[in-house]
Amino acid sequence: MSASNKGGYKTPRKENLMSIENLTNSEEESEDLNTAMVGNAVESQPKVTSRRSTRRPSPTKKYQAYQKESNGKGQEERIVVNYVEMSDERSSDAEDQEEEESIEESENAARPAAKDLHLIQSEYNVAGTSMFGFNTPKKRDAMALAALNATPCTPKTPKTPRLGVKTPDTKRKKSMDQPKTPAHVRTRVKKQIAKIVADSDEDFSGDESDFRPSDEESSSSSSSSDAGNSSDNDAADDEPKTPSRARRAIVVPVLPKTPSAARLRQSARAKKSNEFVPESDGYFHSHASSKILTSDHTLDRLKNPRLAADRVFSLLSEIKTSAEHEGSINAIMEEYRSYFPKWMCILNEGFNILLYGLGSKHQLLQSFHREVLHKQTVLVVNGFFPSLTIKDMLDSITSDILDAGISPANPHEAVDMIEEEFALIPETHLFLIVHNLDGAMLRNVKAQAILSRLARIPNIHLLASIDHINTPLLWDQGKLCSFNFSWWDCTTMLPYTNETAFENSLLVQNSGELALSSMRSVFSSLTTNSRGIYMLIVKYQLKNKGNATYQGMPFRDLYSSCREAFLVSSDLALRAQLTEFLDHKLVKSKRSVDGSEQLTIPIDGALLQQFLEEQEKK
């Protein structure tokens, strides 16, 4: 294949050259400017050497050929430049052909080609971008963009994706968006409401039968109702539907059925029957009468209603126990007696002895007193005695042992005086034996504080016993440190004969000593006006002691007596004082037949007379 055909250039024919010359001669005057431009173009062409050009053809496009194209009407021809996409991947044969073409083009470049002249002399101008497509297009602000890209920038922190919370629609918008409930659904709901109202009206009829349908009837009724509902649904589905565009599914809330009164009663009965649990005392509750009857079978109607205290104790002493039991008790007591030297050593070291355990410790402490302390100064205190007071105990120490006279009225001042007296005679020691440190008259805070202060004196040694299981609750940390006890378990299994001699008992005539002691302690804590009011009630009750129909002192009589004695100024003040008496059970109040309020003191007349005599002496 020749180089001319490959390169796309054709050798100009002779006829073409002649036509070009004639055209130039006839239009010489009008085309002077074009001829000058042709000369300049020819002169400006560089001389081509045999050296291969260092510039490589465009990698993407190359001139293929100049083709002539007419518009179909014989008018002027125009040059159309066709581009052929070139592949970057060429074979070795194609490279050899391109070398041959470049050599041939360099040989023919020295003379102008006919096509070049034709292009210059043509009436149409060819755009430079069509011919010189290898020029690099300029970009505006390219250097500024390059400098900006070369500048290091801090990378942007990726934004945290926001959870899109949709703004709730307004009520008006919702009403506009949501379509209306279909007509057949509204009709069905209306029928159901009317049916419920009719059922509720029937429940209030006169015949309220307790008829309960069986399982078969209920199942049949439910199946029939389901069938009715399905038929209604089928009828609704058979209605012709108007075609419309797709809508959202409409959820129609099903109205809950209102339970009728009869159904509620039936469910309540069923629930009550299911929750019934038989109780052991249910029979007595069902057969008991509302009125509570008090029996008159009292101890006074017995042949021997109540015995004297001496008689009771003599009868109890005649009871004989078995020899084995007595032998065991004696063995236990002998073991405890062997502890006496240890207890004496502990007392001399500054500690105090506390005995606890089941059984009376009175006999054991008395044995220690007789056998060990017969040569020492000893003060025995019976804590179970109902009339015992701390003042009596302090007076015994100051007057009988120290010969210091009557102790001060304040118990703490009396303890201070005792401590000062013992400091003057350090060789004198006092052994204080307290039976039942937790007795009824020693359980108050004041008595325990005085005893703890006495136990802290170096010259006084305390030996006590307790019987109540909760006795340690009486003492706080300070009292325990003052007592400085050494605890000993002395379970004797002996009866509490002496400890219970003064307790209230229905079998003993002299019961009430404890109540009398309680009344003394409460009475001593009252104010002057309260004591005067209480003494008026005591005197009135003793005055009517022999009256069999005595029911109590009327409230109006008490109020008038208090007004005359200037003890109260109003009815409310008197009732406030009586409230305190009622709380401490010093007075009982009851209503008589006529509705008046009667006040009585629940203590035997002999004890009440003894109390009055004691108060008059003071």
Curated annotation (Swiss-Prot):
Superkingdom, taxonomy of origin:
Eukaryota
Classification via InterPro entries: ORC2 (IPR007220), RecA-like_ORC2 (IPR056772), WHD_ORC2 (IPR056773)
Q: GO molecular-function annotation terms?
A: chromatin binding; DNA replication origin binding
Identify the species of origin. Answer: Drosophila melanogaster (Fruit fly)
What the record says about family reads: Belongs to the ORC2 family.
Q: What is this protein called?
A: Origin recognition complex subunit 2
Q: Principal place where this protein is found?
A: nucleus
Where is the protein situated, by its record's location annotation?
Nucleus; Chromosome; Chromosome, Centromere
The terms describing its cellular component in GO are: alpha-heterochromatin; heterochromatin; nuclear origin of replication recognition complex; nucleus
Q: Which gene encodes it?
A: Orc2
Q: Name the segments for region: Disordered.
A: 1-116, 149-274
Known role: Component of the origin recognition complex (ORC) that binds origins of replication. DNA-binding is ATP-dependent, however specific DNA sequences that define origins of replication have not been identified so far. ORC is required to assemble the pre-replication complex necessary to initiate DNA replication. As part of the ORC complex, might also have a role in mRNA export.
According to the UniProt entry, which residues carry Phosphothreonine?
A: 24, 151, 154, 157, 160, 167, 170, 181, 258
